[in-house]
Each structure stands twice: as structure tokens, then as C-alpha cells.
Regions:
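Ribokinase/PfkB-type carbohydrate-kinase core domain
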Residues: 1-30, 45-163
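Flexible glycine/proline-rich, aromatic-decorated loop/lid segments
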Residues: 31-35
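Divalent-cation-assisted or electrostatically stabilized phosphate/pyrophosphate-binding catalytic cores
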Residues: 37, 41-44
């Protein structure tokens, strides 16, 4: 397997797909809420990681590849956070803003156990023609420059039949 992994080092990889922000709130549970029979998590740490197709790109970077991401994100705080994370890692991208919020998966962990996951996303996001064309144009521009194409489809709208 090391031979296969070494063979992709230095490759330029186009990642097309649904990017997401994974947010974690970690804390301790010492009591049950008086309002409802649910644990109260006293949050001691919060952090974000790249999720979905963005996580694929991060993993490719870790394998020595040069990922290039084409995707959509919201014109919101979480979208800005993701753009900063891509910049900090040096991952090239073309991320087009949509009117929908950035897909965000928020997990609350209490005493090392996941208590709940909150999904911030629009159900069955459909691309308008303009955004679809921007994605297609970005993919067409990138194809001559890359060695590998990865499609990371989570069913959130980027990878439709046209794209």
C-alpha cells in the first residue's frame, strides 16, 4: 500500500463536491436540565474542521497531493471560516457563494459521548443556471492542470447530472 500512496505524492487533484464545516462543542455533563430530561453540557472547548469534500481535500494534502477544490458555500460567517481554513492550509479553491447557508454539521460532545448533532443546511439544494455554469467553467479551467479528479458527492447539490 505504501507504493500506491507514494505514487500520488505531488499529484494535482481536482476535488468537486459538497464542502461542509464540522463544528464541535466539547464539554462536561454534571446534571440534567430542569426544563427537559436532557443533559446540560458545560462547553469547555469549541473547534472547527473541514468536512465533506473539504475533508477529502485536506486528507489529499496530508498524502502529499496538491488539491484544488471547486464547490459552493454560503455568503456567511461559516463560509468565511472555511475560506480562512483553506487559505491557512494552502488549499487552492474556487468556492462560489450561494443564497443558501454554508452546510454546517455541529456536534455537541459531553463526557466523551456525542449528545446531539445539529445540521444547518437547505434540503435538496438546486443550482440555478448561473451558479451551475460557474461550477462547470471552473471545472473546465482546472481539468488541463490536474492529474486526478475526485468527485465527493454528499447529495447536497453540487454534483448534479450536468456538473
Amino acid at each position: 500500500m505504501n507504493t500506491e500512496l507514494n505514487s500520488i505524492k505531488g499529484k494535482k487533484v481536482l476535488v468537486i463536491g459538497d464542502v461542509m464545516l464540522d463544528t464541535y462543542h466539547i464539554g462536561d455533563v454534571k446534571r440534567i436540565s430542569p426544563e427537559a430530561p436532557v443533559p446540560v453540557v458545560r462547553v469547555t472547548r469549541t473547534y472547527n474542521v473541514l468536512g465533506g469534500a473539504a475533508n477529502v481535500a485536506r486528507n489529499l494534502l496530508g498524502l502529499g497531493c496538491s488539491p484544488y477544490v471547486v464547490s459552493l458555500l454560503g455568503n456567511d460567517h461559516n463560509g468565511n471560516t472555511m475560506q480562512e481554513m483553506f487559505a491557512d492550509l494552502g488549499i487552492r479553491n474556487e468556492l462560489f457563494h450561494t443564497e443558501h447557508p454554508t452546510i454546517t454539521k455541529t456536534r455537541v460532545i459531553g463526557n466523551s459521548q456525542q449528545v446531539v448533532r445539529l445540521d444547518f443546511e437547505t434540503e435538496n439544494e438546486c443550482l440555478n443556471e448561473e451558479t451551475e455554469q460557474k461550477l462547470l467553467d471552473a471545472v473546465k479551467r482546472a481539468l488541463p492542470e490536474v492529474d486526478i479528479v475526485v468527485i465527493s458527492d454528499y447529495g447536497k447539490g453540487v454534483c448534479n447530472d450536468t456538473v
